[in-house]
A protein has these predicted regions:
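Domain-level recognition of nuclease-like catalytic cores that cleave nucleotide substrates
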Residues: 84-116
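Basic, glycine-rich
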Residues: 21, 31, 100-103
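Conserved catalytic cores of phosphodiester-cleaving nucleases, focusing on short active-site segments
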Residues: 37-59, 67, 75
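Acidic-basic catalytic patches of nuclease active cores, encompassing PD-(D/E)XK
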Residues: 1-28
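Mid-chain, well-packed structural core segment of small domains
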Residues: 60-88
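Residue-level signal for inorganic ion chemistry
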Residues: 18, 75, 95
Length: 116
């Protein structure tokens, strides 16, 4: 299975998890020339921008470790565009990472809130 297809599976798992936790999914795969945000949700008065990282092992560290400072900068930039386009500037905002680890037929989800 290629990396992109595997990532899509992880994003679907994350979306199901978020819905069960009471998040309203506003948009998925929001693209701009500068980058992309995997999932944008709303809960209470907070807009949450979520990066999903899916892995099958921990050989290169935890999935969240792949969200480096450059990636964080791009996510923040893209988030500003989304907020402006959708006139949502009055909301609180938060940036999260959801780690999906799929090993030996089992799926582990780790939701890290407020990573930036």
């Amino acid at each position: 299975m290629n990396t992109r297809r595997f990532g899509i599976i992880g994003e679907k798992i994350a979306q199901d998890y978020l819905r069960k936790k009471g998040y309203e999914i506003l948009e998925t795969n929001f693209y701009t020339k500068r980058g992309e945000i995997d999932i944008i949700t709303k809960k209470d008065n907070c807009i949450i921008f979520i990066e999903v990282k899916t892995r099958t092992n921990l050989n290169y560290g935890t999935p969240a470790m792949a969200v480096n400072s450059n990636k964080k900068k791009n996510i923040k930039f893209v988030a500003k565009i989304f907020l402006s386009l959708n006139r949502l500037k009055e909301h609180e905002i938060r940036f999260d990472v959801i780690e999906i680890l799929i090993m030996e037929g089992k799926c582990k989800i780790n939701h890290i809130e407020g990573i930036m």
